[in-house]
Amino acid sequence: MFAPLLRVLFGSKNDREVKRMRRAVRAINALEEQMVALTDEQLRAKTEEFRGRLGKGETLDQLLPEAFAVAREAGKRVMGMRHFDVQLIGGMVLHEGKIAEMRTGEGKTLVATLAVYLNALAGKGVHVVTVNDYLARRDANWMRPLYEFLGLSVGVVTPFQPPEEKRAAYAADITYGTNNEFGFDYLRDNMAFSLEDKFQRELNYAVIDEVDSILIDEARTPLIISGQAEDSSQLYLQINALIPRLKRHIEEEEGVVTQEGHYVVDEKTRQIELNEQGHQFIEELLASAGLLPEGDNLYSAHNLQLLTHVYAGLRAHVLFHRNVEYIVQGNQVLLIDEHTGRTMQGRRLSEGLHQAIEAKEGLPIQAESQTLASTTFQNYFRLYHKLAGMTGTADTEAFEFRQIYGLDVVVIPTHRPIARKDFNDLVYLTQEEKYAAIIGDIKECQTQGRPVLVGTASIESSEYVSQLLKKEGIAHQVLNAKYHEKEAEIIAQAGRPGAVTIATNMAGRGTDILLGGNWEVEVAALENPTDEPVAQIKADWQKRHQQVIEAGGLHVIASERHESRRIDNQLRGRAGRQGDPGSSRFYLSLEDNLMRIFASDRVKNFMKALGMQAGEAIEHRMVTNAIEKAQRKVEGRNFDMRKQLLEFDDVANEQRKVIYHMRNSLLESEDIGETIAEFRREVLGAAIGQHIPPQSLPEQWDVAGLEAVLQSDFGVQLPLQQWLDEDDRLHEEALRERILEALLVAYREKEEIAGTEALRTFEKQILLRVLDDLWKDHLLTMDHLRHGIHLRGYAQKNPKQEYKRESFELFQSLLESIKRDAIRVLSHVQVRREDPAEEEERLRREAEALARRMQFQHAAASALAPQAEEDDLEVVEEVPLPGTAPVRPEPKIGRNEPCPCGSGKKYKHCHGQLN
């Protein structure tokens, strides 16, 4: 009740933040004349001066006004661009580790230079993260002259880059790259066999462009490095032949069955489930195909792999549609990003789903893969000491940014007032009527000379609109995943008078649509541009620009609402950049997916009550509000899914950090002899304890069993029974010490033959290999645990707590296995003299061969989320998560302190065992 009044009196939190920063803007502006008076050399020398002051104890916050003033002056001299006051505010928001929401055309790329320059002064590296390689290269090349003028180095990381180039790019003061490449390089670094093979420094500061796309849209997509698993392509083909015989079971909300079938589809959660008739029928089909023994059960433990194939086939046929979720190009299935409409090169769905789609489309089936290393963007970006982001649309997701990443959103005022008109939605009864109205609107804009951008949700929709326009003889350009090579060129000219451009969702994001077209692109197309043709191109563009402004600017037409309001706002934001005129309108129908699945029956009943006729539309604020309510419902569901993914992956993330910390410690250690000796003592103690229980009588000892274990696990034959027969006083502890001494003697003999240095190198490489192999197997086991854990809910158990408990037990077992396997390999190895340098080179060649066989994937979101319906997710108590700040360096934990994992054990007996 009082909130609106208080907001009027004191302003919103956002207003107060902006007001606070305007004081700093005045301080920066006061320095402008002083900076103008400096020569280029004096301005460049400021960078070294700032670094010196940092070394003497000044902070980046204290340097900010002067550093921003220097960056602004350098921008004017090098690029002819002066940072506006609101852009200075944007730079401060980024420096403070927050998200700056800036409208389209407000110069986000230029804003980033302020915070990037200031934070690069510390010499710890700054990463600028973009959504694709084109934008990474474009922005780096665009801003490179500014940074180099100020004495800073710039690098770009790209896929398939030679190692030397990539290492140099990461060593630069400022590194541009995509979220995928930064994430994969982090995983690669944690598979390296020497420190020299690593690329990244400590993760210091990152500025994420289009932060909503990366931290929200991509959050449920794990990054996976995988190797090839066993080939089961024939099984995919056999299952694929059976799936079309299954029918969908359809039941209306009132419980009336309209079609008897074998499986049920939940369109809201994109889940598919075989019913009782389906289980019986598929078992009969599998038995007749010779894939399931007669009388056997599909749910038997030894048939679970077969069940996985059946569900993969079902999902491929029912939930994945060609030209909607994927396209076929050559002999490949390329996934389409639902948020951008772009193809996702190199990404493959996990759990056999990609292979099932290949079988469905009759394409060569690529081998399955096994996870070697994985993480999520949520956990990767929380490793940075400081994180910031920019986007045109973040405010609708402010709660999630705060909750998951500890990032506040600050809405930056526009340099010029927004002149765009956003019309109410027009809702039609059928899609046919809706598309007819869209064509009518396009025709009207063409007669006025206005450019039109038509946004569609899928390739299928964009091609349907294209066909309708062809019938009407209207010239147009289509921009979707099939034609993404032309993306920048098409978007650059989408603002010409009367131009019609059809784009899937946010294809072309990152490139502004300039009214009248882009004259710079025309100049770039000239072979030998001279002043005269360039001047003519500029003059022609000025006429077109004025013509489009007088006609009303760019008109954005959306053919349907997206599940997220943010994506709709991004589409609207293509019009009306930098105070230009423009307009937007959404055309909807009751047959659209969002309306059909999520919009309330109230809207449908309301429209029917009006007695609407064919071709008529309803335009009412109540309808628009009802649709936004449906979108908020979907956004809430998607947030819950992302939050749940994070809660499950946080368990794996703690284990990942322990393993990667151990790996790095191994790489940094010159001598791990003491670690190996400690492992040997522990492994031997466990082996003796199994055969000679503590405080037991000699009659209870299994001496023969212990002799066999010593030979199989430690590679030594010791006459234990003879020792005991010869010495009546040989008690348990003395026997243990005598066995250990015998093992040490045998190991020292190997050390004398191989040489101490060579053996230390060999120990390190063996331990790294054992760790990597067992970690890979552990990831697979964790996947299996995660996929079935939701079933514990039926036993009145909390799936999350069960997952934490069992994964901790698995991790304890992993730690023991690492020690045991490393000692077993080192005990059995046959030693011969070899140059340590040759050995290391051989191992490096093997690692490179492995890297060539690796696949870098974005798995389906379900690879990290448990397989569960929404009801299963609600077994646990709903408690809001506290905000999670970006990860800072953790304080050192004492060996006798309680382990932070919550096991109740001392740190040295738990996660500290391997440190």
From Swiss-Prot:
* Ranges for region Disordered: 881-915
User: Any binding details for the cofactor?
Assistant: May bind 1 zinc ion per subunit.
Where does the record say this protein resides?
Answer: Cell inner membrane; Cytoplasm
Which cofactor(s) are needed, names only? Zn(2+)
Binding, ATP = 87, 105-109, 512
Q: Spell out the protein name for this chain.
A: Protein translocase subunit SecA
Its keywords, alphabetically, are: ATP-binding, Cell inner membrane, Cell membrane, Cytoplasm, Membrane, Metal-binding, Nucleotide-binding, Protein transport, Translocase, Translocation, Transport, Zinc
| Signal sequence, renumbered to the chain | none
Using the UniProt record, name the top-level EC class of this enzyme in a single word. Answer: translocase
One GO cellular component term of this record is: cytosol
The lineage is: Bacteria, Pseudomonadati, Pseudomonadota, Gammaproteobacteria, Pseudomonadales
